């Protein structure tokens, strides 16, 4: 009697949880999370995993749910799979099946009770602003071009420093959030100018839906003297969400990394990912006339 080839899944004696250090260029994606009619990073990644482990349903979990157009240098993702593929081999195998705009830096084995989102102790985001007079094609996908005035970094730092600690940030939470509360702890803030580029970094235990983009738009208003530092602080402390309307564009935002009690990767995915354009000098001479300084009036 002839035997038919079996389509059953091969035996897997040890279910495994794999963690990935992930980078993606967010311009072509509707965000991390799978959507019915959108091209998401999650959908692309799960499709690639299913090609390698087609015998079980695949579900991925991420440290941060980035929005449309937002980039990631150190996103962390986990999924459960069988033991046919060694943990370290998942990274090269997935890179051979993913679009070039998504790269897996490293893949490691984690305990079954470890979770990419719930085990994280912090996330760190960077927002990049191009504050030069002339637009630059090669900066456009990675930064927000604001050129009306030279940003006042001193005022912006004052506004940022007031946010440190545990607070209710519901003024910086977009409608549609599923969170039960809006309290989170801002652990570190940093603002650096290098030539025409201004970099803002914020590290927190967690972020609300749309928080960074809403915050950055208000911060730029402070830097352009359209909003006082005091009014900025009153808006979020008094939860005046109706006064926070504008959001900064997604393409200037990057998830730098997620942190855990113990470092899980042998090389951090974000370590050698300093954007090349942030290190560049301003336009070569002859320099254009300087931008006008922001006036002291508050609008």
Curated annotation (Swiss-Prot):
Q: Where is the active site?
A: 67 (nucleophile)
Cite the entry's keywords alphabetically.
Answer: Isomerase, tRNA processing
The UniProt record gives the binding positions of substrate as 125
Query: Could you say which EC number(s) this protein's record lists?
Result: 5.4.99.12
The Gene Ontology terms for molecular function here are: RNA binding; tRNA pseudouridine(38-40) synthase activity
Q: SUPFAM superfamilies recorded for this chain? A: Pseudouridine synthase
Could you say which enzyme class this protein belongs to?
isomerase
Alphabetical list of InterPro entries matching this protein: PsdUridine_synth_cat_dom_sf (IPR020103), PsdUridine_synth_TruA (IPR001406), PsdUridine_synth_TruA_a/b_dom (IPR020097), PsdUridine_synth_TruA_C (IPR020095), TruA/RsuA/RluB/E/F_N (IPR020094)
Give the PANTHER family listed for this entry.
PSEUDOURIDYLATE SYNTHASE (PTHR11142), TRNA PSEUDOURIDINE SYNTHASE-LIKE 1 (PTHR11142:SF0)
The UniProt family comment states: Belongs to the tRNA pseudouridine synthase TruA family.
Name under which the protein is recorded: tRNA pseudouridine synthase A
Q: Which organism is it from?
A: Parasynechococcus marenigrum (strain WH8102)
